[in-house]
Regions:
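Active-site beta->alpha loop and helix N-cap motifs at the rims of alpha/beta catalytic domains
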Residues: 2-144, 150, 161
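Conserved active-site and cofactor/substrate-binding residues in soluble primary-metabolism enzymes
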Residues: 21, 28, 56, 60, ...
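Catalytic alpha/beta core domains of metabolic enzymes, predominantly
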Residues: 124-130, 137-242
Length: 294
């Protein structure tokens, strides 16, 4: 089993004015996050509008990403409900030497742990060399992993099921498995998670907090006093007042208007919320200039 650890951003997707995927700028965006302190990124997570982007565009991006300078530092989100499409997308990704996948179980439908286990079993059977990070986000997909379900999956597939992104926050303090990465989905859980044995975070707001998050992570690993954690938590709590994708694109678009482009039904913040977000970050002395792509 190959764990992942550190600070991972759920990287944003950059779109052209016709709402097609801008491959060059999406890759550049992810690379900038790594340059700013992230250990890696998740490409095509929910923050990257994965469920809204055509598979053909995703594959085209992966072809370019496979030749990029940080090609080994990316997790690939599937963002698909269909089992067969998920498997086919993973096989194409695998052919490009991407082996680590962030996979959310299907949305819309009601099902039990047994059904979730069956879903991942079919994926592992079809792509046995894959390494899978489970995506626990009940708010988005309607299903919440139990500790027992994850324990059963890891017992069944110890070499394939290597971690979980916990955005429902029912696991990160309680799930204890050897050689298994537990990654909360919020900076507000970073330090508490590390103290509980977690491996790091995978979050949307690391698109702007990469430097702060890395500082908190490194200080913990080096047994230094925490000088930045409260500010990091305050910044995350500020973003949590809004739709995260809308807030991030609104903030980035102040430096580069290409970030105004969002796939429906997503949209930018209204002017009142934009003003409040910017002012709240200013009140926190949160400097974003060096972190926004020009």
């Amino acid at each position: 089993m190959t764990k992942i650890s550190g600070i991972y951003a759920a990287s944003m997707s950059v779109l052209n004015s016709d709402l097609s995927l801008n491959i060059e700028k999406t890759i550049s965006h992810a690379e900038n996050l790594i340059d700013q302190g992230c250990h890696g990124t998740a490409i095509f997570g929910s923050t990257g509008q994965a469920q809204l982007i055509p598979i053909a565009e995703k594959i085209k991006l992966l072809n370019s990403l496979s030749e990029s300078k940080y090609k080994d530092k990316h997790l690939i989100g599937t963002g698909l409900n269909s089992l067969n499409e998920t498997i086919n997308f993973m096989k194409i990704s695998f052919s490009l030497n991407f082996k680590k996948f962030l996979i959310m179980p299907p949305a819309y439908y009601k099902y039990r742990d047994e059904d979730a286990i069956n879903f991942y079993t079919k994926i592992v059977d079809a792509v046995p060399e894959s390494r899978i990070i489970l995506y626990n986000f009940e708010k988005l997909c309607g299903y919440k992993f139990s500790i027992e379900c994850i324990e059963r999956l890891v017992q069944k597939f110890p070499n394939q099921i290597i971690g979980v992104k916990d955005s429902s926050y029912n696991l990160f303090e309680k799930l204890k498995l050897k050689n298994f990465s537990v990654m909360p989905g919020s900076e507000s859980k970073l330090l508490k998670g590390l103290e509980s044995g977690c491996s790091g975070i995978i979050t949307a707001t690391c698109n702007v907090t990469s430097q702060l998050s890395r500082k908190v992570y490194d200080d913990f690993k080096e047994n230094k006093n925490q000088s930045c954690n409260q500010k990091l938590v305050d910044v995350r709590n500020t973003f949590d007042k809004y739709n995260l994708i809308s807030a991030l694109h609104t903030l980035y678009s102040k430096k580069n208007r290409i970030y105004e482009n969002l796939l429906p039904p997503l949209s930018l913040l209204n002017k009142v919320d934009e003003k409040n977000l910017v002012q709240s970050l200013k009140n926190l002395n949160f400097e974003t200039k060096s972190q926004l792509a020009a």
